[in-house]
Amino acid sequence: MGSDVDWTWKFTPRAADQFDSLDTHIQDRICSKLDEIVESEWRAPGEFLDPLTGGPFSKLRVGQYRLACILDRSESVLEVHRIEHRSGAYTADDD
């Protein structure tokens, strides 16, 4: 059963920049998926995510894109930290 807590989602500045560079139809798809997660009556937000090894992030798949997310349970917020095409989502970067 879903969560009794009202959840919301937000982008970090980096994710917001990545989001802004995407085509509108991809942006719409990502927002729809994030809304579905925080509004679900049947599943808790964490049930939509797959944990990534070696760090605090979980993965959310939206079509060809991967979102690196953290669930802030104390604030009931799904924080999106990165949005990347799946071809480059799992490569190391400088930060």
Residue ranges of predicted features:
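Enriched for short, Lys/Arg-rich terminal
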Residues: 1-8, 25-28, 62-65, 70-95
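Surface-exposed, Lys/Arg-rich phosphate-binding patches that contact polyanionic backbones
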Residues: 14-25
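Active-site micro-motifs of SAM-dependent methyltransferase domains
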Residues: 17, 36, 85-88
